[in-house]
Amino acid sequence: MHTLPDRFEFLSDAWIDEARRVLAKACEQRKAELAPFSLSERFADAPPHLKLPDDVGAWTARYDGEAMTVARGFDPSADVTVEGDYQAGLAGGQFIGMLAPGAMKAMRREVAAMHGRDAVKMKGRIENAAAGEILALLHDHLGRRTVENPDLAHRAARQGLTRHIREMEEQGYTVIERAISPEFADEVRAATLRALLPHQSFSMNWMLYHGREFEQLIQNPMLMTLIDASLGRGAVIASFSSIKKGPGTGVIPMHTDYAHVPEPFPEFSLTGVGVWALEDWTVASGPTWMIPGSHRERRNPRPGENTRGQGVPIEMPKGSVVYFHKAVWHWQGDRTEPGDRVTLHAHFNRGILRSLEPKKTDVQMLHRNSPRLGEMLGEDDWFDKMSAQGRDSGRFAYMNKLHAFTEAKKRELLAN
C-alpha cells in the first residue's frame, strides 16, 4: 500500500528494513555495553495485500557480539520469542514509551482487553540491560512510524467488529463492550476528574491536552475501526469533551447533532461520536437513550413529536464505548442513583470538514504516539498545506488511495 514517507505497515519489507537499520546502528554505537542477544517474532493472519508466505509475518534479530543481523523467519531458540495474531501484534506495536515504568504491563493488559489473553504470547528474557534498552527504543521508533492495517474488512474481522459495522449501518449506533481494561477506565476517570477540578465545572472541552491517558484513549484501535467504516480514512477530531452528571433529571432533550445541516440529511455520515463509559452504565445511572434506525429519517425530531417510547437505554459495562451516527435521535436519561457518571465524548468529522476545536498540534504529542493521532489532527491530509505552487500532491494522492481502498473493503464487508 502507498504510505507517506517514513511510514510503513507492520511487518512489511519497509518495516523490516527500518528495524535492521536502527538495530545495526544502535549495536555498533553501544558495542562495549552489549552481550549477545536475540529476539524472534511471528504473527499469523496478516492482511493478504502484504503478500507474506501463508499470511505469516516473522522476523528475527540476532546480535552475536560483533554484528547485528535481521532477517525474515522465526527462530524458536531466540532469547525472547513473541507469537500471536497480526492485528493484536500491531496494536501492541503502536504503544509508545516502553522505557517508562509499567509500560510493558499496560501494553499487554490493553492488548488482552481488545484481543484476548492468548492473542500475543511472549517467552524468555533479555538479560543484558543495554540490549533491553535498545529493543525498547526500537519498539518506540517503529511505533511512531507504523500505520494502521488499511484493510478494513480484514481488520474488523480480527477485532470481532464485523457485526458492529453492520449494526451501525442498520440502527445508527453500536456498542463495543470492554474495549479498554477496567484498570485503564479507572485511570482515565481519575485523569478526567483531575482536569475538571480546577475549573469547578461539570464539563470541559480540549481533553486531549490534559494527559497521556486521553491521547491513548482517543486512538483506541477498536473505535478507530468504527470511525473508518463510518467516516472514511482521514477523519479528524472535531471535539474531545468530558461530562460529569450527578443525580437528577436528564437535562439534554431528544435531538440530533446535525444542528446546522439542512434537511434532508445526507444518506452517509458526516460526523460521529464515541462515548466512553468509565463506570457501568445502567438505566439508573442516567445513560444516553437512542431510537434505533432514526438516522434514516434524515431530519431532526419535531417539537412535540412523541417517539420516546421507541427509545433504548445504552447499558454497557465499564470500559465500553458506544459509537453513533450523529443523525440518530438521542437524549440524556435520568440518573436515579447516587454518585457521578463521568463520560468522555470523542467527536469526529469526515476529513473534509473543520474541527470544532482550534487546531493545536503539539509536536511532542505527535512524537509520543503512533501516526494515527497525527491523522486525526489533520497532519496527514493536504488541507492547510497549500503553497503558491498548489496543494501537497503527495498527501493528496496518499489520502485518495487510502479512501478508495477503505471504501472497497467496506463494501466487501457489508456484502458478505
Question: What is each stretch, according to the model?
Answer:
Residues 147-264:
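Non-heme Fe(II)-dependent double-stranded beta-helix
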Residues 77, 85, 89-105, 220-224, ...:
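Short acidic (Asp/Glu) patches
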Residues 1-158:
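Feature captures hydrophobic
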